[in-house]
Amino acid sequence: MKVRVLGILMNEKLSNISKMFDKVLKDCVTSNIKITLYFDHIRIQAMNERITYTDDIFDVNTDISCDQKFSLLVDAGTLISFFKNHNQDIEIEIKNDYSIVFKYDRGSFSSTWIEDKAFPDFFYPVGDGIRVMSSSFIQSMKRSFAFVGSDEFRPAICSILLNVKKDYIDIVSTDMFRLFINRKEYANAVEERSIMLSEVAASILYRFLSDKDTEISISTDGVRTFLCFDNVIISDMNVEQQYPNYEYVCNKFEKSSSVKFDRDLLISVLNSMTLVDNVVNVKVDKENGITVMSEDFGNRKKIMESMPLNALEGPCFNFSIGKENILSSVKSLIKGDTVMDWSDQYKMIKMFNPKYESTYVLNQTLYNL
């Protein structure tokens, strides 16, 4: 059985696999690449405990009839290393004695292949998905994952939620104390659905498409999330449809007061608090504006800074909160004026840029002063 393929194309596909799986534990699955030969193309597949990757190469010549296919496993390291240094036309011959020979103009290289009977099955998208452009969607994902903190709640999540509604998509990320809702207009939804996307799968999209403007199809079968672009299919395994009910939290928020201020000025004030403690006390009133204070009683350290506010609606308010909690929340918002709503009933703050009110952060404060 023979197939002829351009080495530069194989190297491009295999280098993507190398980037995806360079840090995983090697075993009989992750150390092999599955190759399936069809009469008009080659399918290359790899997987680890969470991600599966499928890509096709159509610019090939094979001696397989249109009603046949043949699949085999080849050592990933061997295959990647060979094509990294051979970009010319390569003739691949698969022999019945479990040897595989790569022939090129200056010589040949031989190795071995094994049967794929024990290799896990690959799953493929079923039904329609949502379609987004990578240029805007990937930036939104980056903001969502950069927002969440490394607390004890995060390992249970490590995912963002794509909540697809009739006219928009909410991209939601959370940790123990915060919710970040990034809303995008979307007019092509066939039905409302919830899709989970892991941080692992998202990082693959960053690597592949961060500098491209490519359409991505995203769908789910309820257990896996599928990402499709160009000829690539990425399956994000073990993604169950369970996520904190963020809509309940958002809907119960009742505003008691509201203050408008400059985003960058508050960031500067919060950065000053690093000198003392990780908990800051925030007071808002018309006379003094916004006052941020941090105090370490044991070491007799205290810092306090004030900044003007642009407008205050409702009574003055105060709260305590983790510095990194509020700092990363403010940073996640678009530059310019920022509005902070305070809910006295639930001791929560909601922050957003008034020009983009549908993208906002909800923070649970620690306690009232």
Predicted features, each with a name:
Residues 1-150, 166-369:
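DNA polymerase sliding clamps and clamp-related checkpoint/processivity subunits
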Residues 156-164:
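A glycine-rich, acidic short-motif signal
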